[in-house]
Amino acid sequence: MSRISKEQVKHVAHLARLAITEEEAETFRNQLEDIITAAEQLNEVDTEGVVPTTHVLQMHNVLREDKPEKGLEVKEVLKNAPDHEDGQIRVPSVF
């Protein structure tokens, strides 16, 4: 017996505002059936003694520590800006 019907597939397609044919509904039903079967096989895997994890690799932040450092002076920044006014960098209008 099928765990998902063609009508359920058509209903979900309707909710997603997708127009699908009868043939597509049957194709998707078969594909979903295969996906459910594959997911159910995971329940059969023996996980006794396996520590539950939230990540595949037990890596922590491998980046350097954030340390505040003194940046450029405003004068230096404005010296490299193509256009500025009143201590602000002027950029082309976006809107």
Swiss-Prot record:
Its EC number is 6.3.5.-. It is an enzyme of class 6 (ligase). Keywords: ATP-binding, Ligase, Nucleotide-binding, Protein biosynthesis. GO terms for molecular function: asparaginyl-tRNA synthase (glutamine-hydrolyzing) activity; ATP binding; glutaminyl-tRNA synthase (glutamine-hydrolyzing) activity. InterPro entries: Asp/Glu-ADT_sf_sub_c (IPR036113), GatC (IPR003837). GO terms for biological process: glutaminyl-tRNAGln biosynthesis via transamidation; regulation of translational fidelity; translation. It comes from the Bacteria. It catalyses: L-glutamyl-tRNA(Gln) + L-glutamine + ATP + H2O = L-glutaminyl-tRNA(Gln) + L-glutamate + ADP + phosphate + H(+); L-aspartyl-tRNA(Asn) + L-glutamine + ATP + H2O = L-asparaginyl-tRNA(Asn) + L-glutamate + ADP + phosphate + 2 H(+). Pfam families: GatC. Belongs to the GatC family. Heterotrimer of A, B and C subunits. Allows the formation of correctly charged Asn-tRNA(Asn) or Gln-tRNA(Gln) through the transamidation of misacylated Asp-tRNA(Asn) or Glu-tRNA(Gln) in organisms which lack either or both of asparaginyl-tRNA or glutaminyl-tRNA synthetases. The reaction takes place in the presence of glutamine and ATP through an activated phospho-Asp-tRNA(Asn) or phospho-Glu-tRNA(Gln). This is Aspartyl/glutamyl-tRNA(Asn/Gln) amidotransferase subunit C. It comes from Shouchella clausii (strain KSM-K16). The gene is gatC.
